[in-house]
Amino acid sequence: MKLRNDCDQIVRRALAAVQPDAAVRRALEGNPFQGGRVVLVAVGKAAWSMARAACDCVGGRLDGGIVITKHGHAQGPIGSLLIREAGHPVPDQDTFSATEEALALTDGLTAEDTVLFLLSGGGSALFEAPLVPQEELQSITQSLLASGADIVEMNTIRKRLSAVKGGRFAQHCAPAKVFSIVLSDIIGDPLDMIASGPAYPDSSTCADARRIAEQYGLRLSPEASQCLERETPKVLDNVETLITGSVRELCAAASAACRELGYEPVLLTDSLDCEAREAGAFLAAVARAHQDTDCSLAFLAGGETVVHLTGSGLGGRNQELALSAAAGIAGLEDTAVFSLGSDGTDGPTDAAGGFVDGGTKERLARQGVRIFEVLKNNDAYHALAACGGLLHTGATGTNVNDVAVLLIRR
């Protein structure tokens, strides 16, 4: 129980340190707006908390606005702002309706006006005006998710199928200025890829999109194929962008929490980008290599793994990472691995991630659960639920990638 208690404290402290509220307030100090209208558009999993912070700072200057976040992530009204919840990771009808409202609010603005655009991860699904039939867009998104395409590859395709992605939302807002505050959820903070870059010049090309479509065998209608050949904006003169929050801050906060609990933290990487199972196996190997240590150690890896779906089970990349590690640390005393999505949701589940220790494999075996078979069916959620290994945080109000931690207590 000691290791699980340590895990829960690390999670709580790390998430508290990466809330976007303070960063939004800093960005809005001095009220950096012109004399015209100011319209707020907040999009993403952290949209509600970012919008609340903005209203605390400049609420008196706002001439309306809209918040678009994931189902279950809104926490109540914010002044006169429209609050909308929509589908993630696949856009739904709520996504399309809310985006149309945002486009209407920002239509017909003048050069004296400003759009305060608050953007966080998840925006690729939550902010969408498709240039192809909605059903085809949803099918393409599902195909990319199932194939294990990474976030950059997914967004390269989605930009070209959208009227708001890849800088096209900023074009729509022109000649108004777009003042954009971005919470990063992609390794390296590429502004044109975060939420598919609605208000940032696009660095990807049509050739990139064609290559990705061929690589993953996407079935595209003639209409969608034509969209891949239409280039996105490469220059936007009406946009000012500030980036705040990233996986680096999440790792630093988790490291500080580990140190406060008596562990010596070791940051392995803040650019983790591989199969979830590979990451879990790697952390297990690190655990075995350091069993002779005479001091408590915490090894941290931040980033975002991927999962290639081979089964029909339920889970997410963080749960799959943790369960993969369970096999490798089986029998190791005072050793645990946990992995967490900072937004509080891991895959299409109500869990944020998973926790395993040296006894997890044996506890599952006593229930007739074999880890290899579970992973083959991508059913980590039910296995972790059976052994008390699910991590639940609820919606966190932030979204800065994932962090996985190996704890060795001495």
What are these regions (language model features)?
Residues 53-62, 80-82, 103, 130-143, ...:
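A glycine- and small-aliphatic-rich helix-loop capping segment at beta-alpha/alpha-beta transitions
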Residues 158, 176-179, 201-282, 286:
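Accessory alpha-helical/coil subdomains and C-terminal extensions
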Residues 69-112, 153, 157-158:
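Glycine-rich oxoanion-binding loops at beta->alpha junctions
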Residues 323-410:
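Internal helix-turn-beta structural module
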Residues 41-43, 66-69, 116-121, 180-186, ...:
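Short beta-strand segments
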Residues 1-37, 41-42, 49, 193, ...:
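N-terminal amphipathic/basic leader segments beginning at the initiator methionine
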Residues 133-222, 228:
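Internal gly/pro-rich beta-alpha loop/helix module
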Residues 262-339, 347-348:
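Active-site segments that bind and position negatively charged phosphate/pyrophosphate groups
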